[in-house]
């Protein structure tokens, strides 16, 4: 896991949760979105990241950001969609904001279905 330039804290309490969904099995054209979460994490290891958001929040001080890793994308695609929904629901139950990386367009259905 990367620390996104120091912004990520591995705490049990968090109000923003990052998850990766390395899934591209339903892509109707090119594959590759499954590598998105890994690539974003690899590019986000340096301190050159600006912790300030457009809304004036400092991600290093005012929020607790946690990277929950990747959702298991093995097995049938319906099982994958179910695991995505379960993961998002757990994040929302904590009153946190989910930030989702990767996944082909079919993953969107799981996200808006909730």
Describe the residue ranges of each PLM region.
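Glycine-rich phosphate-binding loop signature in dinucleotide/nucleotide-binding domains
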Residues: 91-96
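Glycine-rich beta-strand-to-loop/alpha-helix junction loops that act as flexible
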Residues: 102-104
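Helix-loop module immediately N-terminal to the HCX5R catalytic loop
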Residues: 78-89
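Short, well-ordered alpha-helical microsegments
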Residues: 108-109
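Conserved small/polar residues in nucleotide/adenosyl-binding loops
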Residues: 112-114
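Residue-level preference for the first positions of well-ordered beta-strands
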Residues: 16, 97-98
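N-terminal glycine-rich anion-binding loop in soluble enzyme alpha/beta folds
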Residues: 1-78
């Amino acid at each position: 896991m990367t620390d996104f330039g120091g912004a990520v804290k591995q705490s049990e309490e968090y109000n923003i949760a990052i998850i990766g969904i390395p899934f591209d099995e339903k892509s109707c054209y090119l594959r590759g979105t499954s590598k998105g979460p890994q690539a974003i994490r690899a590019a986000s290891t340096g301190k050159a990241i600006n912790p300030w958001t457009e809304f004036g929040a400092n991600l290093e001080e005012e929020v607790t950001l946690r990277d929950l890793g990747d959702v298991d994308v093995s097995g049938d695609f319906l099982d994958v969609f179910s695991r995505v929904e379960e993961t998002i629901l757990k994040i929302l139950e904590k009153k946190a904001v989910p930030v989702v990386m990767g996944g082909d367009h079919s993953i969107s259905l799981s996200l808006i279905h909730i």
